């Protein structure tokens, strides 16, 4: 049973997504709060599933496959919803596009490399990028309530969320470039062996 807990958490993160979308569209404070809580739970399980798998030595191929997919689904869904409702707008949309584009490119690269049995390990900077993305999205989801709780003169929850979104977009570019470079190097070295 212990071996299954990390995968159950990962699958649970995917199952949360439709409920998150539903809560996002519920009107009023309780809809916003429910969407925020679901996003935070999903974000926390991202940390928890990997930690438990490593701690108990129960890492699995299924977890290796599903974990990055679950991350991308929740982050992409949240970013799209925040753009659609105007929370992320104007030039800020560029940061969301950078994040989404990188996720698609790296997913394709990982799939391509997996065919050659080449693993592309997650870097510490990529982990930091994910944390920044999730914190920025949580702040943006917190809405007016978050702005009342976090309000330092010119910086409220929304402003800090946008700043962190841009920081995560910058890290996204850097880590995306690093992964692409390593992936292309692997692919070219494999071609040279043939």
Where are these regions (language model features)?
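Hydrophobic alpha-helical transmembrane segments of integral membrane proteins
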Residues: 2-3, 11-15, 64-67
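Residue-level signal for threonine
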Residues: 10, 60, 123
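Membrane-water interface of transmembrane alpha-helices
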Residues: 104-112
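Core segments of transmembrane alpha-helices
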Residues: 12-19, 70-79, 106-107, 129-141
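Active-site His/Glu-centered metal-binding helix of metallohydrolases
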Residues: 15, 44-52, 69, 73, ...
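C-terminal membrane-associated helical module and adjoining short loops/tails
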Residues: 1-7, 17, 27, 35-43, ...
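Residue-level signature of the transmembrane alpha-helical core
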Residues: 14, 37-40, 69, 97-100, ...
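Membrane-embedded alpha-helical segments that form the functional core of polytopic membrane enzymes
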Residues: 16-65, 78-98, 156-171
């Amino acid at each position: 049973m212990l071996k299954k807990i990390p995968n159950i958490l990962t699958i649970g993160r995917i199952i949360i997504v439709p409920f998150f979308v539903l809560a996002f569209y519920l009107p009023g404070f309780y809809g916003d709060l429910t969407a925020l809580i679901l996003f935070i739970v999903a974000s926390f399980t991202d940390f928890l599933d990997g930690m438990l798998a490593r701690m108990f030595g129960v890492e699995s191929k299924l977890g290796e496959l599903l974990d990055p997919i679950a991350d991308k689904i929740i982050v992409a869904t949240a970013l799209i919803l925040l753009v659609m409702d105007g929370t992320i707008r104007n030039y800020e949309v560029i940061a969301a596009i950078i994040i989404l584009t990188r996720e698609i490119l790296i997913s394709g690269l990982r799939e391509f490399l997996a065919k050659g049995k080449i693993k592309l390990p997650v870097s510490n900077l990529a982990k930091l990028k994910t944390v920044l993305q999730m914190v920025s999205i949580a702040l943006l989801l917190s809405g007016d309530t978050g702005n009342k709780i976090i309000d330092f003169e010119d910086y409220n929850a929304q402003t800090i969320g946008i700043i962190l979104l841009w920081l995560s977009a910058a890290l996204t570019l850097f880590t995306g470039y690093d992964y692409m470079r390593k992936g292309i190097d692997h692919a070219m070295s494999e071609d040279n062996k043939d």
